[in-house]
Amino acid sequence: MILEKYGFTSFFEEQKIAATSSYGRVTAVFRDFYRVITENGEFLATLKRGNFYELSPSNLPAVGDFVEVSNEKQILSVLQRKTIFSRMTKDSEEQLIAANFDYALIVMSLNHDFNLNRLERYLTVAWDSGATPIIILTKADLVDDLTPFTMELETVAYGVPTYYVDNLSHRGFEALEADLKPNSTLVLLGSSGVGKSSFINSLAGADLMKTSEIREDDSKGKHTTTHREMHLLANGWIIIDTPGMREFGIGLNQAGLETTFSDVEELSKDCRFHDCSHTSEPGCAVQESLADGTLSLKHYENWQKLQREMAYHARKNSPALARQERDRWKTIQKSLRTHLKTRPKR
């Protein structure tokens, strides 16, 4: 079966569709249509508008989705997903990136792109997706001593499989390939210019992807991937490539944040107050760890930043929370005005 090569398992087959329909998997998403692979081949399909009219953007098909397709090449429904990667837009709307993958490969290069704060953000959405995160550090040929990078990674990604690779010499690929399960679906996350396209070519053993050079002055690259697309490799792995994303908003699920910052979460259990904000309360275990140096200040500040961002998106998506926030600020402003009126004049 063609679809078995594309990751079709009993999990999806047990989701029944109409007898006149076919199972398919979305292999690429364009503005007005989708590329779908079925047992009858690959073709471009459109949505049956009436079936998706009232659904939010997060319920529309994404690359990796298994779908129900009609004989008229229309997508009738999206099957239940096993994993999902999405990001929050500036308008606090969820934008779907990919679905039904086994591994989330976070690709960073060992030049100016190496950024622990960004890595923590990627790890948060990777854990949140339900897939297994793997860190891929490209351009390993540029570094003589990898020890400092390894030590930094252990502070934010302890236990996450990490591979230093060189696309030119194929260094590191043998170990990675040995650890990936056969016929797995991999989604690649990372900024532009980190070598994702070259990485795919190295993993595939063929020039599947167009590559571009990066500027030497700031290590920034051009977008060689302009849309989300799936590739079936000869060795059986399925790769979902995504356009470079240097910045993106995290979603509303707390689980990914708790896993990425598990050290902070564990410390918070020892705080004196159960509702401790970990800023200035007495008996705060998090603040005590900051004071004695066992907790990194940068790690803590990034945790706070992502907490605030998640709370912001939650308020934007919940009228009740938004109203509570407005009421809270009204109370603060009222107290401030009362204080200014009653304070002694100089």
UniProtKB/Swiss-Prot annotation:
Organism: Listeria innocua serovar 6a (strain ATCC BAA-680 / CLIP 11262)
Record function comment: One of several proteins that assist in the late maturation steps of the functional core of the 30S ribosomal subunit. Helps release RbfA from mature subunits. May play a role in the assembly of ribosomal proteins into the subunit. Circularly permuted GTPase that catalyzes slow GTP hydrolysis, GTPase activity is stimulated by the 30S ribosomal subunit.
Enzyme Commission number(s) of this protein: 3.6.1.-
Gene Ontology biological process: ribosomal small subunit biogenesis
Subunit structure as annotated in this protein's UniProt entry: Monomer. Associates with 30S ribosomal subunit, binds 16S rRNA.
Binding site for Zn(2+): 271, 276, 278, 284
Protein name: Small ribosomal subunit biogenesis GTPase RsgA 1
Subcellular location(s) per record: Cytoplasm
Record domain CP-type G: where: 93-248
Assigned GO CC terms: cytoplasm
Molecular-function annotations in GO: GTP binding; GTPase activity; metal ion binding; rRNA binding
UniProt-listed Pfam families: RsgA_GTPase
Cofactor binding summary note: Binds 1 zinc ion per subunit.
Family: Belongs to the TRAFAC class YlqF/YawG GTPase family. RsgA subfamily.
